Regions:
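Sec-dependent signal peptide cleavage junction
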Residues: 18-34
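Aromatic- and acid-rich polysaccharide-binding/catalytic face
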Residues: 203, 250-292, 296-314, 349
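Recognizes extended acidic, P/S/T-rich segments that occur
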Residues: 70-97, 439-477
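Boundary/entry segment of secreted carbohydrate-active catalytic domains
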Residues: 121-156, 171-179
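Active-site groove signature of glycoside hydrolases
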Residues: 191-215, 235-243, 263-276, 302-306, ...
Length: 511
């Protein structure tokens, strides 16, 4: 009996020891899963403001016995992935300026489900361009709620150990810029090693003072970029004006590319300054040209340099009218850019606010980084709802409709002349770029009433490549006074859009 008691005691001790081991192991596993849940997602960082486009969700693959991961964005399943490597990555695309949530759900082989903590992040299109000479010396990009930047170089300010450290945590986009002592292949290799997603290419190759390349030479350079790009997404060469208006440089460059070369152009980088400003329609016309670029090339657009400035027109920062013009332009254009899903990113060019000719387009002072009123407007626009943005007490909204139709309707049509003839009149119209045709409307009523007695009629005429469109309207009533107006129309994505009516011309028909 005594022997039996000893045996039972030993069995009980072993059982207790074993159960303790199981309990300890269970606690360890629970600790591991809790730790993983809190530390799973590596990027984006919590509450981070990041640039629109392709976004990486990265997480640690440190849980044991994972069967598969599920990636959720805003609560919607986007991808199911098998575990592989130390760090997992899922890439998704968005140009919506808003806040997002990301969560990773791990399904283990024993059917246990482990969820990561929810990660909040915010997306903006807004960026900034700075150089190491003076533009980047003092400014804090966070003061304008910026999501990305570039510096006309393939190395970031951080890589250059630049004195202003406030750019260190901001997404950097490298640029080839032009021919350099460092080969294209080495610049692309460097960018890939750094983990950058994009590469801007040649800067204003159509200008002698910039990268200065002929279209045929640029095609060779473009091939070099394609051969060296690795995982980089390439932006187009940025001509000094809208590509769609660059007949002497961009058109021959583009037409000389084969389909593979075109396919490797992930986005079009636009440099386009507004050289004059009449009224709000000027800003809408600017947006219309952006629309036309996308309609023609079907590629996402980055506006990497823009402002209101011109060597011939002055925009003085001490002139209230000039300041108001630039501010109105910014409000309208930024509203339109943020609304357009095909616009991925934009960055305003900061002219020195102390320059008497271009300073009205300055958004911050080079020496102090202090924002101008225009800079405060820039800071207030394009911020996702819910983001803890820096806000400024300046008006930054506009009631202007910036839809495609409204932008086309801002494009003017000009009638050079209307001349009376025998039972007829002739007209001369200034050609509108990329017009599909024109409408000539004439009536005995200056308001163009459709009542029968006013004989209001509209004639459609086709567009030509000529700079002036001439024609004649016949079979009119002699000695009667007719009112005449003209408007162009465009066809974009198969739909007809009408431009603005011309001024009304009055003509009295001859006998």
């Amino acid at each position: 009996m005594e022997k039996m008691k000893k045996i039972l005691a030993m069995v009980l001790s072993v059982a207790l020891l074993f159960s303790g081991m199981i309990f300890d192991n269970t606690v360890t596993k629970a600790d591991e899963t809790n730790t993983w849940s809190g530390e799973a997602i590596i990027s984006p960082e919590q509450n981070k403001l990041i640039g629109a486009g392709y976004i990486d969700i990265k997480w640690n693959n440190t849980l044991e016995n994972v069967k598969q991961y599920k990636v959720y964005i805003d609560g919607t399943l986007k991808k199911t992935m098998s575990p592989s490597g130390d760090i997992m990555k899922f890439e998704f695309y968005t140009t919506n300026v808003k806040g997002y949530t990301a969560q990773i759900v791990a399904e283990l082989k024993d059917n246990t489900v482990v969820k990561s903590d929810v990660r909040n992040f915010y997306v903006t299109k807004k960026g900034i361009c700075v150089n190491r000479k003076d533009m980047g010396a003092a400014v804090d990009p966070a003061s304008m709620n910026i999501g990305w930047y570039y510096d006309w170089d393939y190395k970031s300010l951080k890589d250059w150990n630049y004195k202003n450290k406030k750019f260190c945590d901001l997404e950097f986009v490298p640029m080839i810029w032009g021919d350099d002592l460092v080969d294209i292949s080495k610049r692309c290799e460097y960018a890939n090693r750094k983990g950058y997603k994009y590469m801007l290419s040649y800067n204003e190759p159509d200008l002698k003072g910039e990268s200065n390349k002929q279209p045929d030479t640029m095609r060779y350079r473009w091939n070099e970029m394609i051969d060296s790009k690795g995982s980089l997404r390439l932006g187009s060469p940025a001509t000094e004006t809208f590509q769609i208006n660059s007949d002497k440089w961009w058109t021959p460059f583009w037409n000389g590319l084969n389909q593979t070369q075109k396919n490797n152009m992930t986005f079009i980088a636009v440099h386009a300054y507004q050289h004059y400003y009449d009224n709000a329609d000027t800003a809408l016309e600017y947006l219309h040209t952006i629309d036309e670029i996308y309609a023609k090339y079907k590629k996402p657009i980055w506006i990497t340099e823009f402002a209101v400035a011109d060597s011939g027109n002055v925009f003085n920062p001490k002139n209230a009218k000039h300041n108001a013009q630039v501010q109105e332009f910014m409000k309208i254009v930024l509203k339109g850019l943020n609304e357009r899903s095909y616009v991925e990113r934009y960055s305003w060019f900061d002219f020195n606010p102390e320059d008497s000719k271009t300073g009205a387009s300055g958004i911050y002072y080079y020496d102090t980084g202090k924002l101008t009123t225009l800079g405060q407007i820039y800071a207030n626009i394009g911020n996702p709802a819910g983001y803890n943005a820096k806000k400024y007490n300046v008006s930054y909204t506009t009631s202007k409709n910036t839809s495609m139709a409204s932008c086309v309707a801002a494009v003017p049509t000009t009638v050079y002349s209307v001349t009376a003839k025998k039972k007829a009149f002739s007209y001369s119209i200034k050609s509108v770029k990329r017009a599909a045709g024109y409408q000539v409307q004439y009536s005995l009523n200056k308001k163009f009433s459709t009542k029968k007695k006013y004989k209001t009629k509209t004639k459609n005429i086709s567009a030509t490549s000529a700079t002036v469109k001439n024609g004649t309207i016949k079979k009119l009533t002699k000695k009667k006074t007719y009112y005449v107006r003209v408007r162009a129309y465009k066809v974009i994505n198969g739909k007809k859009y009408y431009c603005k009516w011309s001024k009304i011309n009055k003509v009295k028909i001859k006998k």
